[in-house]
């Protein structure tokens, strides 16, 4: 074989090897792990801006897209999830796609958040005197030291902090210091619908049904596209996710629940920036 052919074959082999390594790296990021940089202080002091987290996708199962025609303005998420090792647990830190845009649930790729799970499907979550309380979990949720700061700080001192909470409905009347109880639906759960329930679950129901949810308080009736409904059966699992820095975190207290499909994976390792 001539020197020229040997050089050519060597270059081809290097290119093939590099392409194979790149393909393997992409496959690993899709199915096994991925990494994200923390952009805000919402998880302080646990995670600080600039920290990197490695997400284990094997634990709950990797999410595989079935439609790669992404719309940066929001769209329906089309995907399935591979079989995982375990379900999400209380106090897991997860990375997920921000679920709410323009007041409704929609999917935008590469718009992510990192928060702590304080309620899983089937739980009832409350904030009582500033502290998270869960009917199915009697240990601390999040950082109680930060929750203590929340309850000890007078409202008059909380400049720039939104005290009202999801669903921002006067009849429900929830605040970040006194919230819930809010039931976190799981697949197959049936909830009898009152106007207050409709206000709480409107976003999730409209996402699942593709119909407008309204209500008449005087008649105590809830409507889906104008048709009365007495109860609703949920089609998805949901999670309540919140930042450890309860004084400065945009989370489920303000925009509601995270659909399971939007969760990318569970944080397995942190690489601190300093």
Where would I find each of the regions flagged by the language model?
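Soluble "head" domains of membrane/secretory-pathway proteins
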Residues: 3-8, 44-274
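Hydrophobic membrane-insertion alpha-helices, especially the h-region
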Residues: 12-31
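Cytochrome P450 fold signature focused on the C-terminal beta-domain
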Residues: 34-35, 119
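Secondary-structure boundary/capping signal
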Residues: 35-36, 102
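N-terminal signal-anchor transmembrane helix
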Residues: 36-46
């Amino acid at each position: 074989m001539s020197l020229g052919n040997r050089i050519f074959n060597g270059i081809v082999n290097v290119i093939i090897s590099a392409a194979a390594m790149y393909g393997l790296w992409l496959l690993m990021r899709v199915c096994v792990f991925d990494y994200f940089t923390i952009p805000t202080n919402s998880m302080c002091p646990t995670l600080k801006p600039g920290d990197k987290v490695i997400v284990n996708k094997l634990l709950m199962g990797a999410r595989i897209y079935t439609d790669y025609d992404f719309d940066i303005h929001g769209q329906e998420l089309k995907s399935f999830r591979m079989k995982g090792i375990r379900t999400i647990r209380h106090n897991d830190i997860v990375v997920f796609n921000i679920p709410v845009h323009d007041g409704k649930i929609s999917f935008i790729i590469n718009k992510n958040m990192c928060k702590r799970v304080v309620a899983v499907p089937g739980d009832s979550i409350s904030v009582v005197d500033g502290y998270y309380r869960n009917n199915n979990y009697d240990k601390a949720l999040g950082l109680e030291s930060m929750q203590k700061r929340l309850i000890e700080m007078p409202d008059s001192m909380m400049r720039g902090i939104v005290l009202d909470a999801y669903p921002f409905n006067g009849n429900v009347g929830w605040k970040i210091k006194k919230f819930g109880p809010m039931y976190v639906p799981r697949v197959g759960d049936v909830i009898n619908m009152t106007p207050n329930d409709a206000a709480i679950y409107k976003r999730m129901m409209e996402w699942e049904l593709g119909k407008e949810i309204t209500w008449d308080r005087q008649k105590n009736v809830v409507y889906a596209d104008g048709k009365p409904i007495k109860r609703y059966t949920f089609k998805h699992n949901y999670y309540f996710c919140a930042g450890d820095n309860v004084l400065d975190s945009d989370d489920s207290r303000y925009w509601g629940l995270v659909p399971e499909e939007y969760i990318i994976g569970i944080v397995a390792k942190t690489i601190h920036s300093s």
